[in-house]
Amino acid sequence: MAGAVPQFMVDEYVLAYHGPLLYEARVILAEVWDESNTLLGTVGPHYFIHYKGWKQTWDEWVPESRLLKLNEAGFAKRRALLDAQAKKGRSTGGSGGTGSPGAGKGGLKDKKKDTKKRGRDAMESESDFMKRPEVKIVIPDVLKLVLVDDWENVTKNNQLVALPRKPNVRELLEEYRQYASASKKQERSDRATALLSEIISGITLYFDKALGNNLLYRFERAQYVEQKRQNPEKPMSEIYGAEHLLRLFVNFGPFIAYTNIDTESLNILRDYINDIMQWMIKEQKRLFMKEYEETTTHYQNLSRS
């Protein structure tokens, strides 16, 4: 369907309406339907989702209107719906009826237990999310200027980062790992030194997972789709470079909120990211593209369709 741009991506965690409430779910498939291929009678972006903690028999296709981003605003909406549902339950007295023939009281009780359990799970999940430590990554002023130029080149000048980049994300992070191992800063703890390789691998994995969902401007999506088509087995960390890695660091705080990581490891991770950015400043002329690639009129029209 022309002009339809999916707001959610495969493997993204979301909040999904099921009945009157919102539940955590994961996007398994994403498709844009039109009148010729719709399965539900609706057109536009649709998603096949799996509800967290539910059996696969509940997996289903839903339109985009059934989904919300998994963030504080989404949790606020879910909390409001839970409160409204609780008030509604109190107002009806909870005595219920005799149920449908053959259902029996046991069936009704089981249904109520199931609903209550899902409600508790939702509240516990939200509570856990709100308790997770926040990671604040401070971007150095020098790199903020790089980000501004990057944004203007892509969104204002209709230019692109030429791909594949050299060095790519995987290569430059390996360069940093070797640099950090050789420097062995005295203030770095033994645990921090031991975690270096694991953290580099983790950042690379985050990049591969986040790029398509969170790190691209709309104008870059057609280029991304083409790269995926040409390199179906190649991770994006072997195609994209410093420009997009820097965008990851800008968004790293919210990403970490969705992981189970202890405070000490969190601080070590933050310190390494800060150190990586300082190293990137030293290597700025080599790592960042000086001139972006001009695009054709055809590409510009394609990216806006």
UniProtKB/Swiss-Prot annotation:
InterPro entries (UniProt xref): Chromo-like_dom_sf, Chromo/chromo_shadow_dom, MRG, MRG_C_sf, MRG_dom, MSL3_chromo-like
SMART domains (alphabetical): CHROMO (SM00298)
PROSITE patterns in the record: MRG
Record domain Tudor-knot: where: 14-67
Compartmental location: Nucleus
A GO cellular component entry from the record: Rpd3S complex
GO BP, sorted A to Z: chromatin remodeling; DNA repair; regulation of DNA-templated transcription
Keyword 4Fe-4S: no
Region of interest called Disordered, as start-end residue ranges on this chain: 86-127
Similarity-based family: Belongs to the MRG family.
Quaternary structure and interacting proteins, as annotated: Component of the NuA4 histone acetyltransferase complex.
Name by which UniProt lists this protein: Chromatin modification-related protein EAF3
Organism: Cryptococcus neoformans var. neoformans serotype D (strain JEC21 / ATCC MYA-565) (Filobasidiella neoformans)
Taxonomic placement: Eukaryota, Fungi, Dikarya, Basidiomycota, Agaricomycotina
Gene name of the record: EAF3
